[in-house]
C-alpha cells in the first residue's frame, strides 16, 4: 500500500528479474543495431587489411557518437511525452 503515500509499489523478485531480462534484451538489441548500422556504413565488404584504417576508425567513431546522440534525444522526447500524459488533467481518474 505504499503507492497510497506517494511511493511506488514494491516489485517482487520475479518482476525484478523480468525487468532486468527486458533491459538486457533492449541493450543487446541496441548494440546489435548499432554494430550492424555502423559496420555497413563504415567498413567495406572486401577487407584489405587486418586492422581498421584511419578512415574506417574515424567513420565508426562518428557513427557511434551520432547513434547515441539520437538515442538520447529520442529517449528524452519519449520521457517528456510520458510525463505529460501522466500529468494531464483527468488522466487515470
Curated annotation (Swiss-Prot):
SUPFAM superfamilies per UniProt: Tim10-like
Record membrane topology: Peripheral membrane protein
Residue interval(s) of motif Twin CX3C motif: 38-63
Keyword tags: Chaperone, Disulfide bond, Membrane, Metal-binding, Mitochondrion, Mitochondrion inner membrane, Protein transport, Translocation, Transport, Zinc
GO molecular function list: metal ion binding; protein transporter activity; unfolded protein binding
Signal peptide: none
Function: Mitochondrial intermembrane chaperone that participates in the import and insertion of multi-pass transmembrane proteins into the mitochondrial inner membrane. Also required for the transfer of beta-barrel precursors from the TOM complex to the sorting and assembly machinery (SAM complex) of the outer membrane. Acts as a chaperone-like protein that protects the hydrophobic precursors from aggregation and guide them through the mitochondrial intermembrane space.
Record's comment describing the protein's domains: The twin CX3C motif contains 4 conserved Cys residues that form 2 disulfide bonds in the mitochondrial intermembrane space. However, during the transit of TIM10 from cytoplasm into mitochondrion, the Cys residues probably coordinate zinc, thereby preventing folding and allowing its transfer across mitochondrial outer membrane.
Protein name: Mitochondrial import inner membrane translocase subunit tim10
Organism of this sequence: Aspergillus fumigatus (strain ATCC MYA-4609 / CBS 101355 / FGSC A1100 / Af293)
Amino acid at each position: 500500500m505504499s503507492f497510497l503515500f506517494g511511493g511506488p509499489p514494491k516489485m517482487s523478485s520475479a518482476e525484478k528479474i523480468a525487468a532486468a531480462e527486458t533491459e538486457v534484451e533492449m541493450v543487446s538489441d541496441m548494440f546489435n543495431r548499432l554494430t550492424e548500422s555502423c559496420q555497413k556504413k563504415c567498413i567495406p565488404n572486401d577487407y584489405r587489411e587486418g586492422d581498421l584504417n584511419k578512415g574506417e576508425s574515424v567513420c565508426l567513431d562518428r557513427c557511434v557518437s551520432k547513434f547515441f546522440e539520437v538515442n538520447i534525444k529520442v529517449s528524452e522526447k519519449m520521457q517528456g511525452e510520458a510525463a505529460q500524459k501522466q500529468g494531464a488533467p483527468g488522466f487515470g481518474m
